[in-house]
Amino acid sequence: MDAEHTDAQHLMGLLCLHDQHYNDALEWIVRAIRRAPKPEYLASFGTALQQHGRFEEALNVVDNAIQLRPDDAGLWRQRGDILSQLSRLDQALASFQHALKLDPDHHDTLRKSGTLLHKLGRNEEAIAHLDLSDKLFPNHAPTLHTRAWILYTLKRFEESATEGKRAHQLAPDKADTCNNLGLSLRRLGRDEEALAWFEKAIAIEPHLVAAFNNKLTTLFHLHRFDEVFALSEHMKALGLNDTVTDWNVALARLLTGDFEAGWRGHQIRLKLPSAKYARFAQPTWLGDQDIAGKTILVAADEGLGDTIHFVRYVPMLAARGARVILAVQDPLRRLMSPLGGVSHHVPMSAAGTLPHFDLHCPISSLPLAFGTRLDTIPADMPYLPSPPDDRIQAWDNRLGPRTRLRVGLAWSGDPAHVNDQARSIPLRTLSRILDADATFISLQKGPRPSDATVLRERHDIVDLTADLTDFAETAALMSCLDLVITVDTSIAHLAGALGRPTWLLLPWTPDYRWLLDRTDSPWYPSMRLFRQTERREYESVLDRVRDELRARASSFEPRAH
């Protein structure tokens, strides 16, 4: 009778737990444990504590249960759940993996292990766990949803879209599934389809900010800018706009030439999670006060290309009577050390040991500070100092006799860049321009494995990049070239800032500074822009480049070495 009595107390606790009466559940289960501390009672006590948000206590209780029954896979699973709630992901994964040793075919443990592996950045292992979970328990919407998202992070967008559609068929009321499916389709260039899925997500969950932001971004890539601005206002009315919304609207303003609103909005970048600009006690200068006699720190706050692009403003600060301290990324320091108007150069890492300054300005805020409009862009070229003659001569000697047009090539940027898929070109695709009668020189540092393979196969590209130790060396090599053909990377900005003839290959929706519907750049007079059409492919762009390159190469007159 006593055993039956404790079981009844435990059962009462479970009933209270089911009805979400957590205090009553705890009371009944504790009574049962006092009479008989069985592992199953302790497990229920742990669950009640979990539901109460008392995770550390729950973990201690479940650990006690495991000591009594160490081969119980369910207890190890529960331990993994609690550790996940405590954000102790490595320990949670270890608990789930131990549970799988005891019960290898438990699909939910496989799914949870896959989710944790993804959070820990071990995506290939995560997919393997989810594949097995799917085989053991097919057509399980949460598994498919998680698998679709991990495939997306692995840039396997076709597979991600397929899994997302399967998940949606099984759980059509899940807004996150619709939203993630839209993301995969957008990465595949299927923006109209993506737009429909974002709208479906919003219909299911009318306040899903991520879906609104993704819809806005898709309208941006469709060049439907009036709708971008209207949607932004609608989001504000709903209280849904955030820094991501404001950032994308600012980029749309700049891309469409509305610099006044665009530069103001551009400041939102400093509030994004990715912002890298240090905090200083001194005031920020944005053009609103006289700087004559003041010392101003100008520090890089975005990428290498942005620093090269906006360093043109530094001499303008000096012309206003300011003493300028310049902090740029290490690969740029030697290149910019002779720059006019700079009183003192400091490394980016010296934020804690800076000399005295009165004001500071992020380098990408200088266009705002100077009130830059399309017709006032400072474009006197070159604005970077010419590389030393001895370094130019050294590179010229390495390239040999100048019997043919010398063309520098850069075909990809940072793989982690949000727009990498659109702006980078596989070397095998770029190779269609290489039949021109020219000497091709790689400017591509750190080619991707697939591109490195192609580079080894080809004997018509001179690759000296191992000796391009910083941007000063790259600038010296560029000074020996007749033309640079590049995608939108720091190489493009370096070539433009040196005043080198440059052909820039652009995606359908480019970075804001290249504007729309023009073949020239007001920022870089020596640059020509070759844009994708609405078809969003580079083959036709490269065909145009090849035709023009052949004509240019055929008219080249050899010069003495």
Question: What does each model-found stretch correspond to?
Answer:
Residues M1-L483, D488-H561:
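Alpha-helical solenoid repeat scaffolds of the TPR/TPR-like class and their adjacent stem/linker regions
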